[in-house]
C-alpha cells in the first residue's frame, strides 16, 4: 500500500535526522541519562519505520486483509506515542511523559502480532 511506503520513508528520514540531532545537537546540552532516552526513541523509530515497509509489502500481497492495514496504523501510532514521548521527555525532562511510552510499546507489540497472524494465515 502506497501510504505505508510513504510513511515508512518519511519516518526513516525522521529517525536518521533525529539521530543526528541527538548525537550532534543535544550532546552536552542534556544529561547523559536523557541522551540515552533520546537514542532509544531513535532506535525504535527506525525499527518501526522499516516495519512500515513490511506492512506495505504485505498489504500489497494480501490486498483486502484489513488486519494488515490496521497493523500499519498501529505501528505508526506506536512511533508517535513511543518515540515521540521519549523525544519530548528527553528535551523537557517532564517525567510524567514516560507514562505515555508504554502505550506506544503496546501498539508496537499488537501490530507485530497482527503481522505474524496475517502472514501465517494468508501467505
Curated annotation (Swiss-Prot):
Protein's membrane topology: Multi-pass membrane protein
Keyword Cell wall biogenesis/degradation applies: no
Q: What lineage does the source organism belong to?
A: Bacteria, Bacillati, Bacillota, Bacilli, Bacillales
- Name this protein carries in UniProt: UPF0382 membrane protein YwdK
- Induction and repression of expression: Negatively regulated by TnrA under nitrogen-limited conditions.
What PANTHER family would the database entry show? Answer: TRANSMEMBRANE PROTEIN 256
| Family per similarity comment | Belongs to the UPF0382 family.
Q: Where are the transmembrane segments?
A: 3-23, 49-69, 71-91, 96-116
Amino acid at each position: 500500500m502506497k501510504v505505508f511506503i510513504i510513511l515508512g520513508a518519511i519516518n526513516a528520514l525522521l529517525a536518521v535526522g533525529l539521530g543526528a540531532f541527538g548525537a550532534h545537537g543535544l550532546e552536552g546540552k542534556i544529561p547523559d541519562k536523557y541522551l540515552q532516552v533520546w537514542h532509544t526513541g531513535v532506535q525504535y523509530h527506525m525499527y518501526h519505520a522499516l516495519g512500515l515497509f513490511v506492512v506495505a509489502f504485505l498489504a500489497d500481497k494480501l490486498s483486502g486483509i484489513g488486519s494488515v492495514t490496521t497493523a500499519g496504523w498501529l505501528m505508526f501510532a506506536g512511533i508517535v506515542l513511543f518515540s515521540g514521548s521519549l523525544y519530548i521527555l528527553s528535551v523537557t525532562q517532564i517525567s510524567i511523559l514516560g507514562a505515555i511510552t508504554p502505550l506506544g510499546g503496546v501498539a508496537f507489540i499488537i501490530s507485530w502480532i497482527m503481522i505474524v497472524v496475517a502472514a501465517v494465515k494468508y501467505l
